[in-house]
């Protein structure tokens, strides 16, 4: 009996460590879920986890939005592995994936845009009376920010990259 225990223990100690991948998946899913909740969605975590693990949305709009977020995350992971640069094309591709099932064509007084294709909004957001941003300046400002951030990301280490990405989110 002791010999069986020692054999089992040795097999346990020499097995590959899979806990790190499980923990990374948990942290990733928790990050995505909290990001989804920041968007004002109230989806139970078990349903969100089911969408991520199966890769299939349910028939409600909220679950399709969660699925789109998951698909956008997978796209970002693939592009990061390929070391694709951060530019407007990448931002539009991610935007199109996030809005794939719930976006659509919108017509404003200044033109048409389709959020499901990753188009930028043609219209202004207002805070009470004053506009928050001039929509015509957004593509140029975003392009400049992408180029600056891309240069910083290639020159920085892993811990600095987190700060750079956080600054990117804050600046834009």
Predicted regions and their residues:
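FIC/Doc superfamily catalytic core
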Residues: 1-172
